[in-house]
């Protein structure tokens, strides 16, 4: 039975997906979360995601897609022997790029959702992130949305609330949703597996910190 007012969120326990989780709770009467283990070096993010979902009273499911880590040995998030790029290379993507990850996540999420009668999928991808990952682009998401509908003869809708937001605007959205403090203190964005403010020097932490400072400055100026 189709549930038109239900959504499944691709959830990792990081800043973006946590913001999306609460965005979904605002827009849908029933929300579930799916988290993926894909051979990432830091499994703490799974426990963080599980706790946030439980505290938010959101059903949580973990799927094992660790085969991804066997397909490409050149990603620093899944291969501990590779030193992480601190800056984006001029002619390529940083080695934090996991080829096909969002395609796999959304495909498995759609199959899982279909079995639950859910046809709204929510993901925290954004074109505004520094990395320029190809599977975070709006054109990719729209293309995959069409493909999933054709593949299963269904009418899925993939929602991307953060697509055009930079990190400062993601912080702003979390504030509007009333979860700013939760996102700031209870999420895990750091590539080195450090909670909240993180390690401070990996690309994810730099992006998060810069966005926070930009948002707080803008908020202060608007209150004058």
From Swiss-Prot:
Coiled-coil region list: none
Entry's cofactor comment: Binds 1 zinc ion per subunit.
Any one GO BP annotation for this protein: queuosine biosynthetic process
Cofactor(s) the protein needs: Zn(2+)
Enzyme Commission no: 6.3.4.20
UniProt function note: Catalyzes the ATP-dependent conversion of 7-carboxy-7-deazaguanine (CDG) to 7-cyano-7-deazaguanine (preQ(0)).
Stated name of the protein: 7-cyano-7-deazaguanine synthase
Keyword presence, DNA-binding: no
Keyword Zinc attached: yes
Pathway(s) where this gene product acts: Purine metabolism; 7-cyano-7-deazaguanine biosynthesis
Entry keywords, A to Z: ATP-binding, Ligase, Metal-binding, Nucleotide-binding, Queuosine biosynthesis, Zinc
Source organism (scientific name): Parabacteroides distasonis (strain ATCC 8503 / DSM 20701 / CIP 104284 / JCM 5825 / NCTC 11152)
Single GO molecular function: ligase activity, forming carbon-nitrogen bonds
Record family assignment: Belongs to the QueC family.
UniProt xrefs under InterPro entries: QueC, Rossmann-like_a/b/a_fold
Spans through the membrane: none
Taxonomic lineage of the native organism: Bacteria, Pseudomonadati, Bacteroidota, Bacteroidia, Bacteroidales
Catalytically driven reaction(s): 7-carboxy-7-deazaguanine + NH4(+) + ATP = 7-cyano-7-deazaguanine + ADP + phosphate + H2O + H(+)
Residues annotated as binding Zn(2+): 190, 199, 202, 205
Residues that coordinate or bind ATP: 11-21
CDD domains according to UniProt: QueC-like
């Amino acid at each position: 039975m189709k549930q038109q007012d239900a959504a499944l969120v691709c959830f990792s326990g990081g800043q973006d997906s946590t913001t999306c989780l609460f965005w979904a709770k605002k827009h849908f009467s029933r929300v579930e979360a799916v988290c993926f283990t894909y051979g990432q070096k830091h499994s703490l993010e799974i426990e963080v995601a599980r706790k946030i979902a439980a505290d938010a009273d959101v059903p949580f499911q973990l799927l094992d897609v660790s085969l991804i880590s066997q397909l490409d040995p050149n990603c620093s998030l899944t291969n501990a022997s590779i030193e992480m790029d601190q800056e984006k290379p001029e002619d390529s993507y940083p080695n934090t790029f996991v080829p096909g990850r969002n395609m796999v996540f959304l495909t498995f999420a759609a199959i899982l959702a279909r079995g639950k009668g859910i046809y709204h999928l929510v993901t925290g991808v954004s074109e505004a992130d520094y990395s320029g990952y190809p599977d975070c682009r709006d054109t990719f998401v729209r293309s995959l949305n069409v493909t999933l509908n054709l593949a299963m003869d269904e009418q899925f809708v993939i929602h991307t609330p953060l697509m055009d937001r930079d990190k400062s605007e993601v912080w702003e959205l979390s504030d509007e949703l009333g979860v700013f403090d939760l996102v700031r203190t209870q999420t895990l964005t750091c590539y080195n597996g450090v909670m909240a403010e993180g390690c401070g020097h990996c690309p994810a932490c730099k992006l998060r910190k810069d966005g926070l400072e930009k948002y707080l400055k803008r908020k202060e100026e608007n209150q004058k």
